[in-house]
Amino acid sequence: MLEARDLYCERDERTLFRGLSFTVEAGEWVQVTGGNGAGKTTLLRLLTGLARPDGGEVYWQGEPLRRVRDSFHRSLLWIGHQPGIKTRLTARENLHFFHPGDGARLPEALAQAGLAGFEDVPVAQLSAGQQRRVALARLWLTRAALWVLDEPFTAIDVNGVARLTRRMAAHTAQGGMVILTTHQPLPGAADTVRRLALTGGGAGL
């Protein structure tokens, strides 16, 4: 379980949120919503331990995140707004970098992400959407329980969004957790996703 307890965050003397508390249990996924500058990416960075709140605490499995950082990161898949891949490597080589023990599974993961036939193409030669798919192919490889995804559908077509949404649904059905930001609808998942709306100084579930 991931828990945010009474989080407070300020940027440039502006309060993004105050008194923000919520939990994400096994089998749940949460969509963080809000306008530009509402603090969506900032919240995800706090939840992953990449930044510290100005007040409050994040807990993982009942322990303060700052005390269990190593075990937490072994349970976390974080894909930020930037794909975080190496453009000089091929799609296959990028996945091998993150998942060196899964060589036999890499082609299938890339195919699931819509990159069949592009396995050995240098990432620098791929489109923005294809580069995004290289990063998202990790969803078919990771064993992490918690997925935190910042705008995962950027530059992804409708069919790709549907396929990725099905993968997230399968992960939560198996007891995993997903937290994501997106401006796009989640096809077939509208009734199962919990929404956390950042409203500028507060939030609502």
UniProtKB/Swiss-Prot annotation:
InterPro entries for the chain: AAA+_ATPase, ABC_transporter-like_ATP-bd, ABC_transporter-like_CS, ABC_transptr_haem_export_CcmA, P-loop_NTPase
CDD domains according to UniProt: ABC_CcmA_heme_exporter (cd03231)
Enzyme Commission code(s) on record: 7.6.2.5
Residues involved in ATP binding: 34-41
Gene Ontology molecular functions: ABC-type heme transporter activity; ATP binding; ATP hydrolysis activity
A Pfam entry, by short name: ABC_tran
Family: Belongs to the ABC transporter superfamily. CcmA exporter (TC 3.A.1.107) family.
Name assigned to this protein: Cytochrome c biogenesis ATP-binding export protein CcmA 2
Organism: Salmonella typhimurium (strain LT2 / SGSC1412 / ATCC 700720)
Encoding gene, per UniProt annotation: ccmA2
